[in-house]
Amino acid sequence: MIVVTTDFVPGYEIVETLGIVTGSIVNSKHLGKDIAAAFKTLAGGEIKSYTELLVESRNIALKRMIDEAEKLGADAVIGLRFGSSSVMQSAAEILAYGTAVKLRKLSE
């Protein structure tokens, strides 16, 4: 599966647009790690447990979006974007979205 942030795939022609595809996850950290993170904000610096959580969540959302595109028979997802929102005090949603398309390779 080709996934790009652009609205085109170099070397290919878009022959069919299949629609918007999304993948999302709502995730939160363990209460103990939340407390440790709160203390870390007082001192400043990176909160590694949250960085790791967001990287993992982004990867899961991306995989879910790709799975949805594959179910539609897509060759690629164009215009990939990520979004995030706070669902509650210690939980965040990560959303991956784009447009599923069918491609044809351009002759060289």
Swiss-Prot record:
A family per Pfam: YbjQ_1
InterPro entries: UPF0145_dom_sf (IPR035439), UPF0145_YbjQ-like (IPR002765)
Disulfide links within the chain: none
Family that this chain belongs to: Belongs to the UPF0145 family.
HAMAP family: UPF0145 (MF_00338)
Name of protein: UPF0145 protein Fnod_0426
Organism: Fervidobacterium nodosum (strain ATCC 35602 / DSM 5306 / Rt17-B1)
